C-alpha cells in the first residue's frame, strides 16, 4: 500500500480555527450528549441518507482537495482508513501515527482504529462506532462517524453568547438573516427549504453576488440553485446538496443542512478575520509610509539647504579687492541681490524644515513609533550651525565691501575734490591778470580811485584767502600721488600750471598797489558817507529780510501753549517796529547827504555806492513788504489758536472713552488668565462658560468702534499726542486683539483636551485630575513644566520616579517620550498624550504579527501571493519589497518573514 505521508509530504497545513483540542467552547462530552437526541433513530430515512451522503462527501472533499485527493463513495473510500487519517490530518493540522502499508483486513482495522483513537483523544465519545463496521462499509456507521468529525472540527467551536454549538450556529444564522423579508430561521430543516435563507446569508456578507430583491419565495429550486452555484463559484464552498432533494423532502436532513451552513459560517468568519487583519495592517502601513515620506522630504530639504550654504560661504569669503569703485559697487549690488532675492527663500526653507521636523516627531510619538534621527550631519542643530557660519561670513563680507568702497570713494573723493578746487581756482583767476595790468586809474576820478584802492585791497584779501586753496590743491595732489591714483599724471600737470600762475598773480598785485597809492587823494567826505551808508544799510537790510522770512514762516504747533508762545513772540516783534522805522530814516538821510555834497561841489558820481548794492529803493520796498506781512501774520496766528482749541476738545473726548475701554480690556485679560487656571467643572462646562465669556467680549465691540470714530477725528486733525490719557489707539487695538486671541486660544485648548479625552478614552475625572496636577506644579503659569516640576507631578499621580537608580531610569524614559527634542519643557498637550498612552491601549508589534498570522493561515511565514490577495496593491508591494526571506525549517520557496518586518515597524529591530 502507498504511504499517504510520502505521497503528500510536500503539503503542510497550519492548525485551523477548530484545532485547539478539547478546550474550545465546552467539553466534547457536553455537545455529544446534546447530539444524542439527534441520533435516536439509527435507521436512516432514505431521503435523509441520500442528503447526508452527498453533503458529507462534498464536505470531506472540500478538505481532502488540499492534500490533492478526494473520495467518490463515502462508505467505500474510507474502508482502508488511509483517506480517513489524511482527512483528520488536514482538518486538525496535526500528524497522526504512521499508517500500516498492508492490504489485509487487520491492517485496515488498525488504520481505522488510529483515526478513531485520534478522534477520541479530542474528547469525543464514540458511541456504537467500531473500526470493523467502517472496514465492512456500514453506511450508517460511516455517516455517523463523519457527522461526529464534522461536529468536532466544524461546529463545536461555533459559540455565540455562550450558547452550544448547534444553538450558536442557529443564533448566528438568525442574526445574519434578520433584516431579510420572507426569512425566519428557527431550525436546520424546514427553515431552509425555500432557499431564501441561503441567499440571505450570502447577500449579507457579499451583496454584490446576489440580487436578493429579485428572488421569489414560491420558486425554491431556483433560489437554492442560485445560492449553491454562487457559493461554489465565488466562496469556494462545494455544492453539498441538490435543490430537488431538499424541495421534494418534507423535512430536509438536519445534519446535512447544519454541515452545509457551517461551511458558510467558516467561509464568512474567515473572510471577516482576514479583512480585519488586512485593515489593521493597512492602517499601520499607511502611518509608516506617511512617516517615511516625511523623513525623505526632511532629508531632501536638509541636503539642498546644506548644499546651498556650502556653495554660498566661499563666495562670501572671497576678499579679492577691485581697482575701481564701479567694480566694487557691482559686488555690493550682487550682495544686495543675494540678500533680497536668494536668501529669503532659504530662510523660509529653513523655517519649514524645522516645522516639518517637529511635525514628524509629533506624528511618530502619537503613533507609538521611535523618534526620527536624521542622517549624520543633517540634524536641525547641524543646519543651525551651518546657518550661523553663513551669517558670520555674510557679516564679514558686508563689512569688507563697505570698507573697500569707502577706500575707493575716498580716492574718488580726493580726485573730485582736487578737480573742484582747481576748477574754482581757475575760474577765480580767469581775467585776473588782465585786470591787474589795466591802467584805468590814470583817467579815473577821485571817487573812482578810492574805489579802485578799496577794490584792490579787497582783491589782496581775496588773494590771501586763496593762498590756502592753492596749498590744499598741492597737498591733495601729493596725497593722490602717494596713494598711486591712476590719473596722477594729469593731476600733476594741472597742479604745476596753477602754482606758476599763482606766482605771476602775486607779482602783478604788488605792482598795481604801488600805482594806486600814488594817486590816492582828494574828497574823503563823500567816500566816508558812502561807507557809513553801507555799514548801516547792510545790517538793516538783513534785519528786514529776516523779518520777512519770520513773518512768512510756516509754523507747526500741536498745543495751545505753543500757539500762545508764537502770538507772544509776534507781539514783541511788533513793538520793535517804531525803532526800526527810525533807523530806516537815518540810513536814507546819509544817502541824501552824500548826494547834496556831490551836487554842491559839482562832483560826477558813478551813480552807485561802491560799498553796497543795497539802494534806498530796495530798503523802501522791503519796508513796505514788512508792513503788509504783519497783519497777515496776525490773522494766521488767530486761526491757528482757534484750531488748537478745537483739537484740545478732541483730545479730552478721546481720553475720556480710552480711560474706560483700556482698563476694561486689562481686567478681562486678567479674568481669562484666572479662568484658564481654575477650570472648574467638566470640559464641556468649561467650554460653554468660555464661549459665553467670548460673546460678552464681542458684545463690547461697539465701545471700541466709538473709540475708533473719535480716533479718526483726531487723525484727521493731525493730533499726535494726548496728555490726558496713557492709552493710544494702537495700544487699545493691540490689547483688544490680544484679548480675542487669548480667549480663542483658551477655547481651542479646551476643545483639544476634549478631542484627546474622546480619542484616548480618558474619563472626565482623569482629565480634571491631570489638569489639577499640571496647574499645581506650573508655578509660573507658563503652560509648561520643567523636569523637576514634571517629576513632582508624576510622583503626585503615583509614578515611581523617586531619586534612586531605578526611579531615575524610569523618569529618563518618560522624559524621552514627552520631550524627544530635549527642550527641557513639557507642555500640557505632551503631558496629556503621555497620560493617555499610559491609561489606554495602543497598537503594538505583537498585534501586527497576529494580524499577519491570520492572513498567512497560521503559518510562520507568508507568501507574496497571499499579500497581494489580502492587501491593497500598493501596500502589498510595500511589504514584499521590505520583508526578509523566511529562514525557518518549514520554509517554502518565496516564503517571507513577517515577524521581523512587524517588529521593525515599531523600531524594535532594523527594517
From Swiss-Prot:
Region of interest (Actin-binding), residue spans: 1-269
Region (Mediates interaction with MICALL2): 736-911
Domain EF-hand intervals: 765-800, 806-841
Ranges where the Calponin-homology (CH) domain occurs: 50-154, 163-269
Region (Polyphosphoinositide (PIP2)-binding): 177-192
Spectrin repeat boundaries on the chain: 293-403, 413-518, 528-639, 649-752
InterPro entries linked: Actinin_actin-bd_CS, CH_dom, CH_dom_sf, EF-hand-dom_pair, EF-hand_Ca_insen, EF_Hand_1_Ca_BS, EF_hand_dom, Spectrin/alpha-actinin
Modified residues (N6-acetyllysine): 114, 214, 592, 625, 779, 859
Keyword terms, alphabetized: Acetylation, Actin-binding, Calcium, Cell junction, Cytoplasm, Cytoskeleton, Metal-binding, Nucleus, Phosphoprotein, Protein transport, Repeat, Transport
GO CC terms, sorted: anchoring junction; cell junction; cell projection; cortical actin cytoskeleton; cytoplasm; nucleus; perinuclear region of cytoplasm; plasma membrane
Sequence positions bearing Phosphotyrosine: 31
Pfam families (alphabetical): CH, EFhand_Ca_insen, Spectrin
Residues the record lists as Phosphoserine modifications: 696, 909
Top-level lineage group: Eukaryota
Residues holding Ca(2+): 778, 780, 789
Region (Disordered): 8-31
Cross-referenced PROSITE patterns: ACTININ_1, ACTININ_2, CH, EF_HAND_1, EF_HAND_2
GO MF term (any one): actin filament binding
Entry-linked PANTHER family: SPECTRIN/FILAMIN RELATED CYTOSKELETAL PROTEIN
Family the UniProt entry places it in: Belongs to the alpha-actinin family.
Domain statement: Contains one Leu-Xaa-Xaa-Leu-Leu (LXXLL) motif that mediates interaction with nuclear receptors.
Function statement: F-actin cross-linking protein which is thought to anchor actin to a variety of intracellular structures. This is a bundling protein. Probably involved in vesicular trafficking via its association with the CART complex. The CART complex is necessary for efficient transferrin receptor recycling but not for EGFR degradation. Involved in tight junction assembly in epithelial cells probably through interaction with MICALL2. Links MICALL2 to the actin cytoskeleton and recruits it to the tight junctions.
Complex formation: Homodimer; antiparallel. Identified in a IGF2BP1-dependent mRNP granule complex containing untranslated mRNAs. Component of the CART complex, at least composed of ACTN4, HGS/HRS, MYO5B and TRIM3. Binds TRIM3 at the N-terminus. Interacts with MAGI1. Interacts with PDLIM2. Identified in a complex with CASK, IQGAP1, MAGI2, NPHS1, SPTAN1 and SPTBN1. Interacts with MICALL2 (preferentially in opened conformation); stimulated by RAB13 activation. Interacts with PPARG and RARA. Binds to VCL; this interaction triggers VCL conformational changes. Interacts with SEPTIN14. Interacts with IGSF8.
This protein's name: Alpha-actinin-4
Native organism: Bos taurus
Chain's gene name: ACTN4
Amino acid at each position: 500500500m502507498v504511504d499517504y505521508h510520502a505521497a503528500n509530504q510536500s503539503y503542510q497545513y497550519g492548525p485551523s480555527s477548530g484545532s485547539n483540542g478539547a478546550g474550545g467552547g465546552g467539553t466534547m462530552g457536553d455537545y455529544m450528549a446534546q447530539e444524542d437526541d439527534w441520533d435516536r433513530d439509527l435507521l436512516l430515512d432514505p431521503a435523509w441518507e441520500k442528503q447526508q451522503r452527498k453533503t458529507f462527501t462534498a464536505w470531506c472533499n472540500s478538505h481532502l482537495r488540499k492534500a490533492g485527493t478526494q473520495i467518490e463513495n463515502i462508505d467505500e473510500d474510507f474502508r482502508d482508513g488511509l483517506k480517513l487519517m489524511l482527512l483528520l490530518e488536514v482538518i486538525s493540522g496535526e500528524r497522526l501515527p504512521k499508517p500500516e502499508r498492508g492490504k489485509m483486513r487487520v491492517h485496515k482495522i488498525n488504520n481505522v482504529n488510529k483515526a478513531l483513537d485520534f478522534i477520541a483523544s479530542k474528547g469525543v465519545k464514540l458511541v456504537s462506532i467500531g473500526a470493523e463496521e467502517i472496514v465492512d462499509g456500514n453506511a450508517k456507521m460511516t455517516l455517523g462517524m463523519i457527522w461526529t468529525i464534522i461536529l468536532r472540527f466544524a461546529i463545536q467551536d461555533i459559540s455565540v453568547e455562550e450558547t452550544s454549538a448547534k444553538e450558536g450556529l442557529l443564533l448566528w444564522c438568525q442574526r445574519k438573516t434578520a433584516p431579510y423579508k420572507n426569512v425566519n430561521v428557527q431550525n436546520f430543516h424546514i427553515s431552509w427549504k425555500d432557499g431564501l435563507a441561503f441567499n440571505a446569508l450570502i447577500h449579507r456578507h457579499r451583496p454584490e453576488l446576489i440580487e436578493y430583491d429579485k428572488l421569489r419565495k414560491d420558486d425554491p429550486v431556483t433560489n437554492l440553485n442560485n445560492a449553491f452555484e454562487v457559493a461554489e463559484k465565488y466562496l469556494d464552498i462545494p455544492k453539498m446538496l441538490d435543490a430537488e432533494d431538499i424541495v421534494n423532502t418534507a423535512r430536509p436532513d438536519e445534519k446535512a443542512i447544519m454541515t452545509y451552513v457551517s461551511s458558510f459560517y467558516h467561509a464568512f468568519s474567515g473572510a471577516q478575520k482576514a479583512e480585519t487583519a488586512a485593515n489593521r495592517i493597512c492602517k499601520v502601513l499607511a502611518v509608516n509610509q506617511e512617516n517615511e515620506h516625511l523623513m525623505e522630504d526632511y532629508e531632501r530639504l536638509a541636503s539642498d539647504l546644506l548644499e546651498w550654504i556650502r556653495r554660498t560661504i566661499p563666495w562670501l569669503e572671497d576678499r579679492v579687492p577691485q581697482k575701481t569703485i564701479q567694480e566694487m559697487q557691482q559686488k555690493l549690488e550682487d550682495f544686495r541681490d543675494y540678500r533680497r532675492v536668494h536668501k529669503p527663500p532659504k530662510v523660509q526653507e529653513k523655517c519649514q524644515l524645522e516645522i516639518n521636523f517637529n511635525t514628524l516627531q509629533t506624528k511618530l510619538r502619537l503613533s507609538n513609533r521611535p523618534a526620527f534621527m536624521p542622517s549624520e550631519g543633517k540634524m536641525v542643530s547641524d543646519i543651525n550651525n551651518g546657518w550661523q557660519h553663513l551669517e558670520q561670513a555674510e557679516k564679514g563680507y558686508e563689512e569688507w565691501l563697505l570698507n573697500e568702497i569707502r577706500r575707493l570713494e575716498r580716492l574718488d573723493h580726493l580726485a573730485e575734490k582736487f578737480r573742484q578746487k582747481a576748477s574754482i581756482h581757475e575760474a577765480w583767476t580767469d581775467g585776473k591778470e588782465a585786470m591787474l595790468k589795466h591802467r584805468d586809474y590814470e583817467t579815473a576820478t577821485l571817487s573812482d580811485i578810492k574805489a579802485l584802492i578799496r577794490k584792490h585791497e579787497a582783491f589782496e584779501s581775496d588773494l590771501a584767502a586763496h593762498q590756502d586753496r592753492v596749498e590744499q590743491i598741492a597737498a591733495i595732489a601729493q596725497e593722490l600721488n602717494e596713494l598711486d591714483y591712476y590719473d596722477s599724471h594729469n593731476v600733476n600737470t594741472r597742479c604745476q600750471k596753477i602754482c606758476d600762475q599763482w606766482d605771476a598773480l602775486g607779482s602783478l598785485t604788488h605792482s598795481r598797489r604801488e600805482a594806486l597809492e600814488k594817486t590816492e587823494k582828494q574828497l574823503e567826505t563823500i567816500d566816508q558817507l558812502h561807507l557809513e551808508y553801507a555799514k548801516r544799510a547792510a545790517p538793516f537790510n538783513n534785519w528786514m529780510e529776516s523779518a520777512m522770512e519770520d513773518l512768512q514762516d510756516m509754523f507747526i504747533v500741536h498745543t495751545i501753549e505753543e500757539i500762545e508762545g508764537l502770538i507772544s513772540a509776534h507781539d514783541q516783534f511788533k513793538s520793535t517796529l517804531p525803532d526800526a522805522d527810525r533807523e530806516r530814516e537815518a540810513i536814507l538821510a546819509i544817502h541824501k547827504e552824500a548826494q547834496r555834497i556831490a551836487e554842491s561841489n559839482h562832483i560826477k558820481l558813478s551813480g552807485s555806492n561802491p560799498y553796497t548794492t543795497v539802494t534806498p529803493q530796495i530798503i523802501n520796498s522791503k519796508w513796505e513788504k514788512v508792513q503788509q506781512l504783519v497783519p497777515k501774520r496776525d490773522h494766521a496766528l488767530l486761526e491757528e489758536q482757534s484750531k488748537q482749541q478745537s483739537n484740545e476738545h478732541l483730545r479730552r473726548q478721546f481720553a475720556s472713552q480710552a480711560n474706560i475701554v483700556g482698563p476694561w480690556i486689562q481686567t478681562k485679560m486678567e479674568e481669562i488668565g484666572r479662568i484658564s487656571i481654575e477650570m472648574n467643572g467638566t470640559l464641556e462646562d468649561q467650554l460653554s462658560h468660555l464661549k459665553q465669556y467670548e460673546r460678552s467680549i464681542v458684545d463690547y465691540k461697539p465701545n471700541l468702534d466709538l473709540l475708533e470714530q473719535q480716533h479718526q477725528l483726531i487723525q484727521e486733525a493731525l493730533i499726535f499726542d494726548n496728555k490726558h490719557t496713557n492709552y493710544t489707539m494702537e495700544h487699545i487695538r493691540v490689547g483688544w486683539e490680544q484679548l480675542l486671541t487669548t480667549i480663542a486660544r483658551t477655547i481651542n485648548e479646551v476643545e483639544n483636551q476634549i478631542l484627546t479625552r474622546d480619542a484616548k478614552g480618558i474619563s472626565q475625572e482623569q482629565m480634571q485630575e491631570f489638569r489639577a496636577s499640571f496647574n499645581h506644579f506650573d508655578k509660573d503659569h507658563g503652560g509648561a513644566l520643567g523636569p523637576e516640576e514634571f517629576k513632582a507631578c508624576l510622583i503626585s499621580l503615583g509614578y515611581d520616579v523617586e531619586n534612586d537608580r531605578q526611579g531615575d531610569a524610569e523618569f529618563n524614559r518618560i522624559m524621552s517620550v514627552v520631550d524627544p527634542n530635549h527642550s527641557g519643557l513639557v507642555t500640557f498637550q505632551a503631558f496629556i498624550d503621555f497620560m493617555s498612552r499610559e491609561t489606554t491601549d495602543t497598537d503594538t508589534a505583537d498585534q501586527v504579527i497576529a494580524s499577519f498570522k491570520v492572513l498567512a493561515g497560521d503559518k510562520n511565514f507568508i507568501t507574496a501571493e497571499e499579500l497581494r490577495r489580502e492587501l491593497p496593491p500598493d501596500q502589498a508591494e510595500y511589504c514584499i519589497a521590505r520583508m526578509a526571506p523566511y529562514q525557518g525549517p518549514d520554509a517554502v520557496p518565496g516564503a517571507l518573514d513577517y515577524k521581523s518586518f512587524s517588529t521593525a515597524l515599531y523600531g524594535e529591530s532594523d527594517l
